[in-house]
Amino acid sequence: MEDFVRQCFNPMIVELAEKAMKEYGENPKIETNKFAAICTHLEVCFMYSDFHFIDERGESIIVESGDPNALLKHRFEIIEGRDRTMAWTVVNSICNTTGVEKPKFLPDLYDYKENRFIEIGVTRREVHIYYLEKANKIKSEKTHIHIFSFTGEEMATKADYTLDEESRARIKTRLFTIRQEMASRGLWDSFRQSERGEETVEERFEITGTMRRLADQSLPPNFSSLENFRAYVDGFEPNGCIEGKLSQMSKEVNARIEPFLKTTPRPLRLPDGPPCSQRSKFLLMDALKLSIEDPSHEGEGIPLYDAIKCMKTFFGWKEPNIVKPHEKGINPNYLLAWKQVLAELQDIENEEKIPKTKNMKKTSQLKWALGENMAPEKVDFEDCKDISDLKQYDSDEPEARSLASWIQSEFNKACELTDSSWIELDEIGEDVAPIEHIASIRRNYFTAEVSHCRATEYIMKGVYINTALLNASCAAMDDFQLIPMISKCRTKEGRRKTNLYGFIIKGRSHLRNDTDVVNFVSMEFSLTDPRLEPHKWEKYCVLEIGDMLLRTAIGQVSRPMFLYVRTNGTSKIKMKWGMEMRRCLLQSLQQIESMIEAESSVKEKDMTKEFFENKSETWPIGESPKGVEEGSIGKVCRTLLAKSVFNSLYASPQLEGFSAESRKLLLIVQALRDNLEPGTFDLGGLYEAIEECLINDPWVLLNASWFNSFLTHALK
């Protein structure tokens, strides 16, 4: 093919095509079909403009011989074939002198007679498919599109073909000649299919032997052989009526394609019921930290030593009492468990040498809280397969819950800035390859925007707790180990700080499978009075354990300190993902990068610096009942991060289902906004699939309510 291109096209065209490919890092020797396509496109652009001039009266004329009359002006400005910078310079100067709207993408020609840019397409497929792809890409009323095919068909905007019959016939003849020349050399099939990105390998080898028999066995019903099936598939025209296609495929399918209009979608139905409750593995906005600055005590970095040191910074402990009981639990046991923790920490201090880990005494309250001996005895299946009425436990349907306002508050808090930095600059990780300059600049800007974010604190807290719990689960399977919940950060002045949120006591943890559960009791400090939103704390027993002096604008005030206690559980696989929560930083960084890329491609230069440093510009963050919310680029970074972190903290099957199904509806609505006239069938079924995931999960319910806000504003 490469030889053919060099023989068939003018050397100037070949040179321009090579240059264009090199600019995009493509190799003409390897991507030969692309090489041929670029040459063909260049030649069509040049032929389009050849011999067309504008005379002194401004009329369009065709001059074929080298007329010495110098007053003629070329009718078309050729943009295709110039290097990008030069091409944009030409486009800008045309726009400045004629007042024509600047196109988003580089067009191929400018027509001085009709005063419009022209996009030329040459396709090996059907012209109207290619025309639609072009129109969708450039999305501009102003740029005129003209498509030619190798079979002599053409299509142009509003059937306005710009040139006279004869000029277009010259182009069609040339394309037909190229096609015949390729075909005579056996190059045409590969060239024709490469546009669709089809793989042409299988035409060159036959499937034989076992593979052939397997292929014949695995055909859909009613097909006798692979050939028979292949012929059927090849007969599928890619365009045409979907209903017809479906009925061709199966007699049982009768889908009516309904147009999807602004009035079609309805809001998602959120469940009724009592308000949903907090289900995260640790407290988020309600957490309270006991902290030490610039820790330098003996054994600093050993969690138990750090925890004891943090506990000693607080002097307001008092006799604990229950202020919000857990509806279903034996509440005195929760109270006894906390007293036991205090007593055993006191015992440690009385010892000569503080141990590195602490295993709690297996008291009755801890055995109850950790579900010790509660699991039904496992019986070998062999011993009971003859029992006639052997059946699984009936499990109750989960109770439907309604959306509560606390989860939106949790999310807002996660987007806020704290006064400490939770990650160092290199936390997102160096690139393995020699990292490009731009990528590291972006990473540093992004890190600066999110290092103080509360969502980042949740990441580090999650990583710490899951790592500690997984370690203890493997190292001390039978013990009720006491695990402090710790995080580390830096203050504004750059001083190190160690924080204690509370404690976890883990139960027996013989985790053979990824999904085997380890129970734990969490006890977390807080200043939030649980009686303000009792529904949020349904799964907790809350004790009042002390009084804390807080500095406020009016001086010192004393506030009760609470301890939120609950039984919880997790598994190896959940802890493994919890340890990987730093990935949320990477995910949100990639989302921001794609925004920068989009901006840069419009402006034709790298926009990283402007993107982060132009403080006046606002960006869309999300939808609320008030409309589209906007904010600074930092706010966008933190919101994307918080979403990613909440997807991790509140991961659940309901979220998986909701994300997958609602995305389909989202794409349909976006297609409607882009005027692509989407059609749907069984929209009711899609709504059912989405709504069956809306049961009781706070994060899913919040996302569904955001989705409804989006629907309202998108369809106005």
From Swiss-Prot:
It comes from Influenza A virus (strain A/Swine/Hong Kong/126/1982 H3N2). Pfam families: Flu_PA (PF00603). Influenza RNA polymerase is composed of three subunits: PB1, PB2 and PA. Interacts (via C-terminus) with PB1 (via N-terminus). It is found in: Host cytoplasm; Host nucleus. GO terms for cellular component: host cell cytoplasm; host cell nucleus. Its main location: host cell. It comes from the Viruses. Transmembrane segments: none annotated. Belongs to the influenza viruses PA family. Mn(2+) 2 binds at E80, D108. A motif (Nuclear localization signal 1 (NLS1)) lies at residues 124-139. Phosphorylated on serines and threonines by host kinases, including human casein kinase II. GO terms for biological process: cap snatching; DNA-templated transcription; symbiont-mediated suppression of host gene expression; symbiont-mediated suppression of host mRNA transcription via inhibition of RNA polymerase II activity; viral RNA genome replication; viral translational frameshifting. A motif (Nuclear localization signal 2 (NLS2)) lies at residues 184-247. Disulfide bonds: none annotated. It is an enzyme of class 3 (hydrolase). Plays an essential role in viral RNA transcription and replication by forming the heterotrimeric polymerase complex together with PB1 and PB2 subunits. The complex transcribes viral mRNAs by using a unique mechanism called cap-snatching. It consists in the hijacking and cleavage of host capped pre-mRNAs. These short capped RNAs are then used as primers for viral mRNAs. The PB2 subunit is responsible for the binding of the 5' cap of cellular pre-mRNAs which are subsequently cleaved after 10-13 nucleotides by the PA subunit that carries the endonuclease activity. Keywords: Cap snatching, Endonuclease, Eukaryotic host gene expression shutoff by virus, Eukaryotic host transcription shutoff by virus, Host cytoplasm, Host gene expression shutoff by virus, Host nucleus, Host-virus interaction, Hydrolase, Inhibition of host RNA polymerase II by virus, Manganese, Metal-binding, Nuclease, Phosphoprotein. Its cofactor is Mn(2+). This is Polymerase acidic protein. Its EC number is 3.1.-.-. GO terms for molecular function: endonuclease activity; metal ion binding; RNA binding. Mn(2+) 1 binds at H41, D108, E119, I120. The gene is PA. InterPro entries: INFV_PA, PA/PA-X, PA/PA-X_sf. Binds 2 manganese ions per subunit.
